[in-house]
Amino acid sequence: MGKQCFVTGRKASTGNRRSHALNSTKRRWNANLQKVRILVDGKPKKVWVSARALKSGKVTRV
């Protein structure tokens, strides 16, 4: 599985990088994902979780 939040499903989004002359090239905005150990089905597991989910208390570390 790729880098995606285990709880909220947040992942990198895409858009355009714009120069001063308004030329455009593709770029990515990466979500603030942290690798943490949480309980999944009663067992500790290392998963990617967004910082927003950690701060809001949607998951607790083991």
UniProtKB/Swiss-Prot annotation:
Gene Ontology molecular function terms on file: structural constituent of ribosome
What's a single GO BP term from this record?
Answer: translation
Instruction: Return the annotated region ranges for Disordered.
Output: 1-22
Give Gene Ontology CC terms. Answer: ribonucleoprotein complex; ribosome
Keywords noted in UniProt: Ribonucleoprotein, Ribosomal protein
Q: Which family does it belong to?
A: Belongs to the bacterial ribosomal protein bL28 family.
What is this protein identified as? Large ribosomal subunit protein bL28
Q: Supply the source organism for this entry.
A: Staphylococcus aureus (strain NCTC 8325 / PS 47)
Gene that produces this protein:
rpmB
